[in-house]
Amino acid sequence: MTKIGFYLATYATIYIILSPGLLATAARENLHHQCFCESPSKCDCFPTTPTPPTSVNKSRKGGPLCTTDGDCKHFCRPKKGVCNIDFETCICQ
């Protein structure tokens, strides 16, 4: 009886560990091609063609990579250069 309990506990543990990953994979697969049809000519499928990723924030004038404002002195001469920390690029002001 001890061996049966051990194998049952091992199986249950493995099942619990793998279940969330299997469910997530199944859910992801179902989202790829779902269509709702009212008639043969009218079907709404989603998701539609994937949109390319876009950057929400864009720098005004991108320059060379920088980590401090001093890195932008040569690039922005004679203007003052500021390092945009978000994009790590120089911005001339």
Curated annotation (Swiss-Prot):
One of its GO terms (cellular component) is extracellular region. Keywords: Antimicrobial, Disulfide bond, Fungicide, Plant defense, Secreted, Signal. Its main location: secreted. Disulfide bonds join C43-C83, C66-C90, C72-C92. It is found in: Secreted. Residues 1-24 form the signal peptide. The keyword Signal applies. Coiled coil: none annotated. GO terms for biological process: defense response to fungus; killing of cells of another organism. Belongs to the DEFL family. This is Putative defensin-like protein 283. The lineage of its organism: Eukaryota, Viridiplantae, Streptophyta, Embryophyta, Tracheophyta.
